Amino acid sequence: MTLRESTPPADLTTVLHAACAQTGLDPAGARLIHHYANAVFLLPKEDAVARITSARHADTARTGLAVTRWLTDVVGYPATGPLPDLDPIDVHDATVTFWTYYAQHGRPRPDSTYLGAVVRQLHDLPHPPVELSRWRPLHSLHAAVADPAQSRALSDQERSWLLTRIEQVQDDLADLDYPLGWGPIHADAWAGNLLWDDTAPAPRVVLGDWDSVCWGPREVDLIPSWHAAVRYGKGPQWARAFADSYGYDLAAWRGFDTLFAMRDLVQIAGPLRQAPYNQTFDRSLKQRIAGVQADDRNPWVEF
């Protein structure tokens, strides 16, 4: 797993060491390798990673852990695997889970063809023996934007406009008929959540980051690849390769534009959290809001 590295805040290090003390894992040499919605630490002594989630999202962390245990241990689905026999640890207003570390050895990241295959496989599975929440599109984003403490990077005008737009897209989503039906969905199925797994008898690609797993319309897991083709400059061939691998052309469905608008809004959530502390994220937030307001199909520049 090769992700953005940074210097961890002192409170995250405290949480990590407290959780490791409860599990008997060795945090020596721990390194923060990702800090976005969650903080992810590499534990080199254990060949594992620790994911630190805010306590307010403890239920989703527990659900993701239970689902991936079923996927990996029972049905043999290619998901990132949690460390065996370790329950989530609640400590210092956070929840910590522990996972297998997948070293990427400088390989190219798996592309949309791999993603289409693993999403198709997921959508063909039965309901897991885990209670899944029902998909609530843009619910957490609406709450964050409505809370001045969480959205202080926004002007009052931006906040008001975004709340109206979120509610409009939510209404549009509720009016759609979903031809692929409802079932267990990943709900953030983009290629950045794919990793090479060399722990299996033969190298394979696994799907990670199961914090958003829920019961919802399967089309939700398809839109990220079309969105990446446009907003992140992957190009039409990226979406076509996904469609060929999955076996369905989402762009031919009448609800495509509504789902694209939803994904645009979803992508505001990440920089919204980080913008008050980081100018790069603030520029990214402003760019994305401008694109949503223009309702255009222009690529977003990575700052």
Model-derived features: positions:
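Juxta-kinase regulatory segment immediately upstream of eukaryotic protein kinase catalytic domains
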Residues: M1-P27
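A conserved alpha-helical element in kinase catalytic cores
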Residues: P9, T13, R51-D93, A103-D124
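Active-site acidic catalytic loop and adjacent metal/ATP-binding pocket
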Residues: I33-K45, V49-A50, P82, Q170-L222
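A glycine-centered beta->alpha junction motif in the catalytic cores
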Residues: A94-P108, A143-A153, D264-Q279
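A cross-family kinase active-site recognition segment
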Residues: G106-S160, L180-W182
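Active-site activation/catalytic loop segments of kinase-like enzymes and analogous catalytic loops
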Residues: R218-L250, M262-Q279
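All-alpha amphipathic helical-bundle segments outside canonical DNA-binding/catalytic cores
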Residues: A251-L259
